[in-house]
C-alpha cells in the first residue's frame, strides 16, 4: 500500500468511526477522543486530517452531496427507465442513503456555517438539471405536458430540500404530511403528475421515519 492509499484508508477509518458514533451517541455527545478511540487512529493522525468534529461533519456533508449528484445523474441518464421508475429510484436512493440519514438525525444545518446555502446552491446547480431531464422525458413520452421543465425542477428542489426538510422546519408530522400532499396536489393541478400513488405512499413513509428519527 503506497502513501496515498494509506492516507485514504486512514481518512476513511476516521469518517466511518465518526459516522457510527454520531448515529449511536449523537453529534453533540461525541468527542474527538471518542472518534480517535473508535477509529484506532493516533491523535496526531486524526488532527492531521480534521481539526474538529465540525470539520468532519462538514466533509460528510460535501461527500454526501457528491454521491447524490452522481446518483441523480445516473438515474436521469438511464434510458432503460421510465419516468415512474426514475422517480422510484430516487426515492429508494434516499431511503437507503445511510450517510444522508445520519446527517439528518444529527441536525446537520446547525453544525456547519453556511451549510444550507451550499446545499441549496449544489441542488440548483447539479440536481435540478437532472430532475428537469426526467420531466422532459415525461413530456416527450406523452405522460404529461410541461412547458417549463427547468423552472419546475428548481421549484421542486426548493420545496423538498428546504420547505420540507425536517432539520430546518419544526412542524409536526401532520403539518409536514399536509405540505407533502399539497405538493402532489399542485403537480396534479398543473398537469404534471410526476408521482404515482405507489411512490407517494413511499415518500410519506420516508418523511414519517425522518421526523420520528430526529
Positions of the model-derived regions?
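Basic, helix-initiating cap at the start of DNA-binding domains
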Residues: 1-25, 29-41, 54-58
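Key DNA-contact positions within bacterial/archaeal DNA-binding proteins
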Residues: 44
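A short His-aromatic
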Residues: 47-50, 54
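Alpha-helical DNA-contacting segments of helix-turn-helix folds
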Residues: 58-64
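Hydrophobic alpha-helical connector segments
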Residues: 59, 73-101, 153-156
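All-alpha amphipathic helical-bundle segments outside canonical DNA-binding/catalytic cores
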Residues: 84-88, 122-123, 136-155, 173-178
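Short secondary-structure transition hinges
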Residues: 95, 99-144, 150
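C-terminal peripheral helix-coil segments that are non-catalytic and often amphipathic
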Residues: 129, 133-140, 169, 173-214
Amino acid at each position: 500500500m503506497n502513501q496515498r492509499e494509506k492516507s485514504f484508508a486512514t481518512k476513511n477509518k476516521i469518517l466511518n468511526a465518526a459516522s457510527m458514533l454520531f448515529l449511536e451517541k449523537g453529534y453533540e455527545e461525541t468527542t474527538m477522543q471518542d472518534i480517535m478511540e473508535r477509529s484506532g487512529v493516533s491523535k496526531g493522525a486524526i488532527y492531521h486530517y480534521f481539526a474538529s468534529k465540525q470539520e468532519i461533519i462538514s466533509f460528510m456533508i460535501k461527500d454526501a452531496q457528491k454521491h447524490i449528484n452522481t446518483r441523480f445523474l445516473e438515474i436521469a441518464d438511464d434510458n432503460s427507465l421510465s419516468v415512474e421508475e426514475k422517480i422510484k429510484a430516487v426515492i429508494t436512493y434516499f431511503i437507503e442513503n445511510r450517510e444522508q440519514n445520519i446527517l439528518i438525525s444529527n441536525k446537520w444545518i446547525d453544525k456547519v456555517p453556511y451549510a444550507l446555502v451550499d446545499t441549496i446552491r449544489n441542488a440548483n446547480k447539479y440536481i435540478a438539471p437532472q430532475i428537469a431531464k426526467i420531466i422532459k422525458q415525461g413530456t416527450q413520452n406523452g405522460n404529461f405536458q410541461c412547458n417549463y421543465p427547468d423552472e419546475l425542477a428548481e421549484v421542486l428542489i426548493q420545496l423538498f430540500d428546504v420547505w420540507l426538510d425536517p432539520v430546518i422546519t419544526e412542524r409536526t408530522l401532520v403539518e409536514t404530511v399536509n405540505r407533502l400532499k399539497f405538493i402532489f396536489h399542485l403537480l396534479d393541478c398543473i398537469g404534471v403528475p410526476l408521482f404515482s400513488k405507489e411512490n407517494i405512499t413511499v415518500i410519506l413513509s420516508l418523511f414519517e421515519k425522518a421526523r420520528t428519527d430526529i
